[in-house]
């Protein structure tokens, strides 16, 4: 990587921040580590081959020195990440303050494009009214850092911008001391988790993002949306188009520890966080609105609230707004108490609000009165933000989806049938299953009996649905709105879930017609399932019963698409094309049956699991597939990187909204050449499958990656694999991708591409020209190549060869690695040919700069990891070697800013 890329004048502040933090870290090392460790770290920063340097130095280090060196390299990656994040925010602010208009991906730029595209106010309002964007936080185990460590990093991030504002040496010294103190705490804190996370731990971690970020970021973003739209379209109003959703506490696919109890715990924690936020905001409003009846007029609605106020202080007699706020707070906190939350209220407790809408109505009475009586500025400040917050967060803070494997649903149905004396469900063919399920769904008679003893699994599953019904009653109808069927393969999978909803009071049958309180969402995730998505849904749409069910849910059908398993099945090219084709087919099918479609994209953080920049990914969707409706999963390290800071959260959520609106209102795009893409997919699939089905491949993978050690990292509450590892399909997608990132091959994101391009273009210049034209003009192909370019820039075939040396069968490993190395050469060459460039990241200076900063420490961590894996394979019970491997996994993930 060319280090001269850091010499751009725009990056002077970044260079200064990085140097400032590095000096603090060296100050720490001089105090805490040996001179040999300090000298080695200094040499790494200028070394062209830091992995080789590690190999040379390591024999001279004892266990403590090895630990210190590993920790130091990881900390350097962390502080450079912080410096980069601060610089991104700095450049954004400079851009905005210079009045240059909106950057790509901003709402300002999107609104400008809408205006330039002659979109009128009515069409924009119509689109906004039909727009729904949701970022869904999941508990997928990809965040390697402990919350404690993340909190240290946030403190440094908050302090670092002060460096530029220090006007004298004393101020700079004080800042240095603060950061040195935090780094010392970080140095003396365990980087790795010693115990496995529980589901409740994951719930608490997910909830912590809200007071840290979302409670501030969402109202600010809505205010910006209103400003941007009303500047161009004065009459346009912005409804609640953006929300945060979650899976944490309701996703039991592969996780036996998720239960009715964890679902209840999740909503108690949600409500505790959101009611504390409301109480704090109401308290601030109380202090900000001491308006006197002698100075202002007040609407009758507010006077009526004031008359019922528990605030009886004499001084408040002439302050109706304060008295009204006291009344509102007492009722809101009354609801908190009714939900079992242990929080007080200085005004006592009044009759609880029955719904968030009642709470909202009272707040709007305050707002209308202020506006009507000349206090608009007060109405449009904190009060407006609180109104928006209540509208978005309600009493539940964020809705949770339920998710379970189709086979688990079928097991419950089979047991219910058995005890009810019905046919043997598992022995029925698909047509018979549909008929039996529709028969049971057509009337009100339940199958479940409280007088029968069911299996633990059936009791567990029915308990979750029953708990979801109670939660909807207590916390609001929007608390649980989706139930997702993973591994959905046939129509009976949807009908089986419908039957379970009926058995637990979430679906009623009235006059033969169903009415559901929850959306039934099929998840198509393997290559075969994606190809079968349209036939499955067409069968459902032809059923009058299902048509009536959709009517009860607003005639919207949500479809979830899985990126991870399809990639593991067929490789990146085939997965991408299968997903695109599935979307194209679904768009036409939904038009045919006049059903509105909402796609839910199950993307991971890495390219191998559908990751990459969200803006480009959304714009690369087929025309008509977005149509204002989109949900996207966000997980692990992505949640931390995108949303743990209010500024980052606002910017990343703004990008989601901007891309959704652009893809919906300005969908003028052409699809890629279907035959060309299919040919590329077919050949890529052939080469990818040749590799992963090679008889020696699974052993190579298990022996030359830290997959076994990743499983012991305590990243999350669910198991790393579904069964004993003997086949690739038994391994979960996250550790599969995570492992390839650790050994620096990133194989799932590119393997097969080079051979496909070479095969298609050999002796056929027209094909090469067509692919190059697609690389210049087609959003789908551009996004695919852009993601691949980013991954290949992080790939290091020389380091990967060191991992190949871990194999217990060198001759077999030589064959497998030879295949990988040759395909890497072909893929890199093909990528450069299609991009018509001589170097990767030529047009992505930001990522090139980022890698240039971190590569020395990243490569050193890989060198340390290989050495420690060798030691661990020889001494499986060596606790020091295992700890070092865990630390290097942590550090490499930080250096790459990706896990799975």
Curated annotation (Swiss-Prot):
The keyword Lyase applies. It catalyses: oxaloacetate + phosphate = phosphoenolpyruvate + hydrogencarbonate. One of its GO terms (cellular component) is cytosol. It comes from the Bacteria. InterPro entries: PEP_COase, PEP_COase_bac/pln-type, PEP_COase_Lys_AS, PEPCASE_His_AS, Pyrv/PenolPyrv_kinase-like_dom. Transmembrane segments: none annotated. GO terms for biological process: carbon fixation; oxaloacetate metabolic process; tricarboxylic acid cycle. Keywords: Carbon dioxide fixation, Lyase, Magnesium. Its cofactor is Mg(2+). GO terms for molecular function: magnesium ion binding; phosphoenolpyruvate carboxylase activity. The active site is at 140, 568. It is an enzyme of class 4 (lyase). Belongs to the PEPCase type 1 family. Forms oxaloacetate, a four-carbon dicarboxylic acid source for the tricarboxylic acid cycle. This is Phosphoenolpyruvate carboxylase. It comes from Neisseria meningitidis serogroup A / serotype 4A (strain DSM 15465 / Z2491). The lineage of its organism: Bacteria, Pseudomonadati, Pseudomonadota, Betaproteobacteria, Neisseriales.
């Amino acid at each position: 990587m060319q280090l001269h890329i850091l010499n751009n004048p725009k990056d002077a502040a970044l260079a200064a921040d990085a140097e400032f933090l590095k000096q603090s870290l060296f100050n720490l090392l001089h105090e805490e580590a040996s001179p040999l460790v300090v000298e080695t770290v200094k040499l790494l920063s200028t070394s062209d081959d830091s992995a080789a340097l590690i190999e040379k130095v390591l024999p001279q280090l004892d266990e403590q020195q090895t630990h210190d060196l590993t920790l130091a390299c990881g900390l350097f990656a962390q502080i450079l990440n912080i410096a980069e994040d601060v610089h991104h925010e700095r450049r954004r602010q400079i851009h905005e303050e210079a009045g240059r208009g909106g950057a790509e991906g901003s709402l300002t730029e999107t609104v400008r494009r809408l205006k330039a595209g002659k979109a009128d106010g009515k069409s924009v309002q119509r689109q906004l009214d039909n727009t729904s964007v949701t970022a869904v936080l999941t508990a997928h185990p990809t965040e390697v850092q402990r919350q404690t460590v993340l909190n240290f990093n946030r403190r440094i991030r908050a302090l670092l911008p002060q460096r530029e504002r220090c006007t004298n040496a004393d101020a700079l010294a004080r800042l240095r001391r603060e950061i040195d103190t935090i780094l010392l705490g970080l140095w003396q804190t365990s980087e790795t988790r010693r115990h496995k996370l529980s589901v409740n731990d994951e719930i608490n971690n997910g909830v912590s993002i809200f007071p840290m970020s979302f409670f501030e970021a969402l109202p600010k973003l809505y205010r910006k949306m209103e400003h941007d739209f009303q500047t161009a379209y004065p009459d346009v109003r912005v409804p609640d188009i953006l929300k945060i959703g979650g899976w944490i506490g309701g996703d039991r696919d592969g996780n036996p520890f998720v239960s009715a109890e964890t679902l209840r715990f999740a909503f108690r924690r949600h409500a505790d966080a959101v009611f504390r936020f409301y109480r704090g905001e109401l308290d601030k409003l109380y202090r900000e609105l001491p308006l006197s009846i002698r100075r202002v007029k007040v609407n009758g609605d507010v006077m009526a609230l004031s008359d019922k106020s528990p605030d009886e202080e004499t001084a408040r007699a002439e302050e109706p707004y304060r008295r009204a706020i006291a009344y509102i707070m007492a009722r809101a906190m009354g609801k908190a108490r009714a939900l079992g939350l242990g929080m007080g209220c200085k005004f006592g407790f009044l009759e609880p609000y029955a719904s968030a809408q009642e709470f909202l109505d009272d707040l709007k009475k305050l707002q209308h009165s202020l506006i009507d009586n000349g206090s608009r500025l007060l109405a449009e400040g904190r009060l407006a933000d609180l109104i928006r917050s209540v509208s978005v967060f309600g009493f539940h803070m964020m809705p949770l989806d339920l998710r379970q494997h189709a086979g688990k649903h079928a097991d419950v149905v089979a047991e219910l049938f058995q005890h009810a004396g019905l046919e043997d469900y598992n022995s029925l063919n698909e047509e018979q299953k549909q008929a039996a399920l529709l028969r049971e769904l057509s009337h009100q008679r339940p199958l479940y009996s409280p007088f029968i003893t069911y299996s633990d699994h059936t009791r567990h599953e029915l308990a979750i649905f029953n708990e979801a019904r109670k939660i909807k009653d207590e916390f609001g109808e929007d608390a649980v709105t989706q139930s997702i069927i993973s591994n959905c393969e046939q129509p009976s999978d949807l009908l089986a879930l419908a039957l379970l909803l009926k058995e637990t009071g979430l679906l009623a049958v009235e006059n033969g017609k169903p009415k559901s309180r929850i959306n039934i969402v099929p998840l198509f995730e393997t290559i075969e399932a994606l190809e079968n998505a349209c036939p499955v849904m067409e069968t459902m749409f032809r059923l009058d019963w299902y048509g009536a069910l959709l009517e009860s849910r607003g005639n919207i059908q949500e479809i979830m698409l899985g990126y991870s398993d399809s990639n593991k099945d067929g490789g990146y090219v085939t997965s991408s094309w299968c997903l695109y084709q599935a979307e194209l087919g679904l768009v036409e099918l939904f038009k045919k049956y006049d059903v509105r479609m909402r796609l839910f994209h199950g993307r991971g953080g890495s390219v191998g699991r559908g990751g990459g920049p969200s803006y480009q990914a959304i714009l690369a969707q087929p025309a008509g597939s977005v149509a204002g409706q989109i949900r996207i999963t966000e997980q692990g390290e992505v949640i931390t990187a995108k949303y743990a800071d209010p500024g980052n959260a606002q910017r990343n959520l703004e990008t989601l909204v901007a891309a959704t609106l652009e893809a919906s209102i300005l969908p003028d795009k052409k699809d890629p050449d279907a035959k060309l893409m299919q040919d590329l997919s077919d050949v890529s699939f052939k080469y990818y499958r040749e590799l992963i089905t090679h008889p020696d491949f699974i052993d190579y993978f298990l022996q030359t990656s830290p997959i076994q050690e990743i499983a012991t990292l305590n990243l999350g509450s669910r198991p790393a694999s579904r069964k004993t590892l003997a086949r690739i399909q038994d391994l979960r997608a996250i550790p599969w991708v995570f492992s390839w990132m650790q050994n620096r091959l990133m194989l799932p994101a590119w393997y097969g591409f080079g051979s496909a391009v070479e095969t298609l273009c050999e002796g056929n210049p027209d094909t090469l020209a067509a692919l190059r034209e697609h690389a210049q003009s087609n959003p789908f192909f551009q996004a695919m190549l852009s993601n691949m370019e980013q991954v290949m820039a992080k790939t290091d075939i020389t380091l990967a060869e060191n991992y190949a040396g871990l194999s217990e069968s060198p001759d077999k490993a030589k064959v497998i690695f030879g295949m990988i190395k040759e395909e890497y050469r072909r893929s890199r060459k093909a990528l450069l040919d299609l991009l018509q460039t001589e170097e990767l990241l030529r047009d992505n200076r930001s990522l090139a700069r980022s890698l240039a900063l971190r590569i020395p420490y990243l490569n050193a961590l890989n060198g340390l990891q290989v050495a420690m894996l060798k030691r661990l394979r020889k001494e499986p019970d060596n606790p020091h070697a295992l700890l070092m491997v865990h630390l290097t996994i942590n550090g490499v993930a930080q250096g790459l800013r990706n896990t799975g």
